[in-house]
């Protein structure tokens, strides 16, 4: 009998997905999760090289995953552009009914219900994704960025999803919204529309459900988000600390990894082949299994 596990022979993974690259808040977040062995992904959209060096970013985010969160953090402009003001943008004097040009062609300042934001034409949006990809990989290394996270949630564009797959080979795009336990904590298979299970609002409650979730023989997935500054604004760093202390440093029960690593591992388990009395691992990933109750591993590109 073949049983599939995560590394460490556990069946539950824990990760996080944190947006925007707020340096001070990300530092505080990391200071809580990292000592407890909890890993995840930071979704970045820009660098402040006037203040921080590439080495600073590499050191700060070392050991974590990095995803593309789109340069300039725009909405997608849908329909006609609308009226564009001639004068330069000034948030204090701008007409809220008009658009204002930014430094990037096809990207405009506009007034949303919660203040001034940016939106981009489809062409400009795709260009910003590519610019962000190049800048991230220049800092973190070629091949370090393999997925996309929508600014402001899923913008409903099949064209953009096709673009990130064809241009950059991305295998996942994260939207916004707490899934909680609605999927039975299954590893997302619709990777172009996946979302996290919990945020600062329900982290401890959802984690308790996850811990109690019965082992049904399948690999499970729990990710929480969504901005480090959320924990500051809601005054709930204590809840994050409680979560990290309670659910961290338990490698025999939880697998801690960046989101993309969990997805790749899961996909590798689904690629296993059983032929007669042989188990074939055609992937480049070591897979943890039990055969007739005995723990073992399937080395990359191996047959046992």
Predicted features along the sequence, with ranges:
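Boundary/entry segment of secreted carbohydrate-active catalytic domains
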Residues: 1-27, 193-196
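Catalytic-core region of carbohydrate-active enzymes that cleave or remodel glycosidic bonds
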Residues: 131, 135-139, 159-177, 197-219, ...
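A short, Lys/Arg-enriched amphipathic alpha-helix followed by its capping loop at the start of a domain
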Residues: 28-38, 243-247
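N-terminal accessory interaction module
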Residues: 91-102, 108, 287-304
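C-terminal domain-boundary segment and adjacent tail
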Residues: 1-8, 48-51, 137-138, 169-185, ...
């Amino acid at each position: 009998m073949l049983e599939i596990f995560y590394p460490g022979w556990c069946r539950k993974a824990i990760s996080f997905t944190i947006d925007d690259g707020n340096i001070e808040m990300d530092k505080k977040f990391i200071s809580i999760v990292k000592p407890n062995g909890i890993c995840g992904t930071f979704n970045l959209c820009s660098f402040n090289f006037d203040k921080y060096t590439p080495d600073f970013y590499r050191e700060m985010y070392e050991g974590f995953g990095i995803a593309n969160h789109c340069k300039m953090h725009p909405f997608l402009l849908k329909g006609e552009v609308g009226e564009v003001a001639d004068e330069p943008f000034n948030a204090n004097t701008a007409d809220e009914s008009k658009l204002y040009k930014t430094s990037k062609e096809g990207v405009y300042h506009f007034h949303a219900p919660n203040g001034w934001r940016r939106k981009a034409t489809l062409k400009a949006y795709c260009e910003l994704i590519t610019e962000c990809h190049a800048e991230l990989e220049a800092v973190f290394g070629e091949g370090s960025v393999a997925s996309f996270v929508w600014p402001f949630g899923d913008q409903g564009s099949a064209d953009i999803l096709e673009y990130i797959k064809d241009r950059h080979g991305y295998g996942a795009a994260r939207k916004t919204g707490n899934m909680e336990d609605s999927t039975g904590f299954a590893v997302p298979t619709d990777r172009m529309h996946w979302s996290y299970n919990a945020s600062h609002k329900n982290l401890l409650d959802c984690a308790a459900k996850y811990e109690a979730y019965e082992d049904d023989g399948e690999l499970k997935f729990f990710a929480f988000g969504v901005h480090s500054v959320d924990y500051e604004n809601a005054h709930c760093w204590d809840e994050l600390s409680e979560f990290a202390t309670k659910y961290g440093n338990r490698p025999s029960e939880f697998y801690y990894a960046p989101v993309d690593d969990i997805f790749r591992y899961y996909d590798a388990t689904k690629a296993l082949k059983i032929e007669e009395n042989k188990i074939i691992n055609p992937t480049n990933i070591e897979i943890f299994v039990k055969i007739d109750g005995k723990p073992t591993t399937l080395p990359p590109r191996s047959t046992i």
